[in-house]
């Protein structure tokens, strides 16, 4: 599960993704929004770092998702079923979503680490399509190098500098 942010701007991130990942971002964003809109503390994926980073900032994730949908529409990728699900979810839960900008997004160091690791991982997924992200491999700085299996991404929810700013589930 991931929300790819190879660039700070949501629309630029959407434009950078290949069709497969672009379409998947719409689905994964919906899944994250659904988890965040569910009060069940045992809900699947509730503690995944991709979910935690958007907790309390669901409105920003909605804007990210809409940037993905807009780009998919430009490319002629069908989004009608996804939009139906998203619209229904927003109608039910949108009033409870937080719309402020996440602290990690406002921090240039955190955002640079996040976008660089996303570029590096996109490159490894499809080196031909993402050839322009090659340089990110050398400067990628994921978190948790001490883990048995280190993270491939920089997760703001794992970073002590930002973990306290990531809202926790009630």
Regions from the PLM with identified roles:
Residues 1-166:
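Expand to "…catalyze enediolate/carbanion chemistry for C-C bond making/breaking, isomerization
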């Amino acid at each position: 599960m991931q929300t790819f942010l190879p660039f700070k701007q949501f629309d630029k991130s959407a434009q950078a993704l290949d069709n497969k990942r672009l379409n998947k971002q719409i689905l994964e964003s919906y899944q994250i929004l659904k988890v965040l809109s569910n009060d069940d503390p045992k809900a699947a994926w509730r503690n995944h770092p991709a979910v935690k980073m958007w907790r309390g900032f669901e409105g920003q994730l909605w804007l990210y998702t809409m940037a993905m949908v807009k780009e998919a529409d430009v490319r002629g990728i069908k989004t009608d079923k996804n939009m139906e699900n998203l619209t229904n979810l927003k109608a039910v839960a949108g009033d409870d979503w937080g719309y402020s900008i996440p602290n990690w997004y406002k921090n240039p160091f955190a955002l640079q680490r996040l976008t660089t690791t996303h570029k590096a991982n996109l490159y490894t997924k499809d080196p031909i399509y993402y050839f322009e992200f090659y340089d990110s491999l050398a400067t990628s700085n994921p978190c948790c190098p001490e883990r048995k299996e280190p993270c491939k991404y920089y997760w703001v929810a794992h970073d002590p500098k930002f973990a306290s700013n990531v809202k926790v589930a009630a």
